[in-house]
C-alpha cells in the first residue's frame, strides 16, 4: 500500500458554524479526524458508537485535548448509536439525525472492520460488506436530502467522504469475476466465492464504485462526494483477525505505519480542503488518483451499474423514503 506524504492544511481553514458527522469516531482515525476538525473550529461534532461507554470516553478524550481546549472549548460534542452490522440500526440512526440535526456540512464514512473468515451480518449479508459498505450506503442515501438542503442554505456544497484504501487495486473481481447473470450482492454473500483475507480489498473497490456512481447523479455544486486512502496507519481495524495472523500484522504496522495524526490530516484534506475537482474521485497522498483500472474497463463499468441498481433496491426495502433520480 502506498504511504502518503506529509499533508498540511492551508492556513486560515475554518469550520466555524459547521456541523460534522463521523461514523466510528470513537477511536483511531475517526477520533483523530474529529480532534483535528474541532481544532479547525467546527461548531458541532457528532460521532457514532455502539455503546454508551465508548461514546462517553471519546467525548471526554476530545474535551481534554489541549488543542481543542485552547481553540474550541465550547463546541457541541455528541454521540449517536449506530451498529453498521444491521440495516435497522442504520435506519434508526438516520431517524435520529433528522430529528436532532437541522444542518449537516460534512459526513465522513470512516467506520470499518476487517475479517479473515466468512461471517454473516444481522441483516443477512456477508458481514464485512454490510459493515464497511451497505449500511454506510443506506446512511448516505438517506441523508442526501439533508446535505442538499444544507448546501442550499450555505450557498456552497456540503461534503461526503468515504474511507478507502489503495488495497482496492488488489480486488478479486478479475480473478474471480461476477457472471453476467449473477447478482453482485449474491456473489459477495456466497460463501463459496469468499476468498479469505481478500474481502477487505473487495469492500474498498465497492466503495470506490459507489462513489463514482453516486457522484454521477448528485451535482458537485450541491454535495462533493469522494473517497480517500489515508495510507498505512496503526489503528484497531484488524482486531477481528485470527490470533495467528495478528503478530505478522503487528510487525508490518510497526515497520510501515505512520502516525495517526498524519492519517487524520489526509482525511481532513479530503473532507474539507479539496474542491469540486475531487467529486466522484479516489484520492491518494491527498491528490486525485486513477485507482483500480478495472473500474474504467467495460467489465468494471457493468459492475458499477449492477452494484448501484442492487444497492438502491436493497436499501429501498429498508427505507422506502430513499429517492434516487438518474
Which positions does each model-derived feature cover?
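Intracellular terminal tails of multi-pass secondary transporters
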Residues: 1-16, 298-326
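Alpha-helical membrane-targeting segments
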Residues: 1-7, 191-197, 232-262
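Rossmann-fold NAD(P)H-dependent dehydrogenase/reductase core
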Residues: 2-233, 325
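An acidic site on a long C-lobe helix of protein kinase domains
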Residues: 86, 206, 259-262, 303, ...
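Short aromatic-enriched loop/helix-cap "lid" or pocket-rim segments at secondary-structure transitions
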Residues: 92, 172-176, 237-241, 293-297
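Non-transmembrane alpha-helical segments in soluble domains
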Residues: 211-215, 268, 308, 312
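C-terminal/domain-terminus segments
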Residues: 227-229, 233, 284-288, 295
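C-terminal helical subdomain
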Residues: 250-292, 301-303, 313, 317
Amino acid at each position: 500500500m502506498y504511504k502518503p506524504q506529509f499533508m498540511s492544511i492551508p492556513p486560515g481553514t475554518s469550520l466555524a458554524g459547521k456541523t460534522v458527522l463521523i461514523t466510528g469516531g470513537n477511536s483511531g482515525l475517526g477520533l483523530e479526524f474529529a480532534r483535528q476538525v474541532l481544532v479547525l473550529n467546527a461548531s458541532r461534532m457528532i460521532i457514532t458508537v455502539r455503546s454508551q461507554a465508548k461514546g462517553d470516553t471519546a467525548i471526554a478524550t476530545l474535551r481534554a485535548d489541549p488543542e481543542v481546549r485552547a481553540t474550541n472549548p465550547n463546541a457541541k460534542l455528541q454521540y449517536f448509536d449506530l451498529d453498521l452490522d444491521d440495516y435497522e440500526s442504520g435506519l434508526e440512526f438516520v431517524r435520529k439525525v433528522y430529528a436532532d440535526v437541522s444542518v449537516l456540512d460534512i459526513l465522513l464514512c470512516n467506520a470499518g472492520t476487517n475479517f479473515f473468515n466468512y461471517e454473516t451480518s444481522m441483516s443477512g449479508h456477508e458481514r464485512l460488506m454490510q459493515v464497511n459498505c451497505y449500511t454506510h450506503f443506506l446512511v448516505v442515501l438517506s441523508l442526501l436530502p439533508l446535505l442538499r438542503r444544507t448546501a442550499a442554505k450555505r450557498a456552497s456544497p456540503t461534503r461526503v467522504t468515504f474511507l478507502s484504501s489503495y488495497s482496492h487495486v488488489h480486488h478479486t473481481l478479475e480473478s474471480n469475476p461476477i457472471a453476467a447473470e449473477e447478482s453482485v450482492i449474491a456473489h459477495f454473500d456466497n460463501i463459496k466465492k469468499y476468498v479469505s483475507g481478500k474481502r477487505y480489498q473487495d469492500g474498498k473497490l465497492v466503495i470506490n464504485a459507489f462513489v463514482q456512481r453516486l457522484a454521477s447523479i448528485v451535482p458537485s455544486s450541491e454535495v462533493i462526494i469522494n473517497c480517500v486512502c489515508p495510507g498505512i496507519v496503526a489503528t484497531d481495524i484488524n482486531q477481528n483477525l485470527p490470533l495467528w495472523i495478528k503478530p505478522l500484522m503487528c510487525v508490518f504496522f510497526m515497520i510501515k505505519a505512520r502516525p495517526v495524526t498524519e492519517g487524520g490530516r489526509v482525511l481532513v484534506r479530503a473532507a474539507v480542503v479539496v474542491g469540486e475537482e475531487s467529486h466522484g474521485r479516489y484520492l491518494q497522498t491527498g491528490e486525485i488518483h486513477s485507482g483500480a483500472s478495472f473500474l474504467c474497463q467495460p467489465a468494471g463499468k457493468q459492475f458499477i451499474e449492477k452494484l448501484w441498481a442492487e444497492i438502491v433496491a436493497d436499501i429501498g426495502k429498508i427505507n422506502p423514503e430513499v429517492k434516487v433520480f438518474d
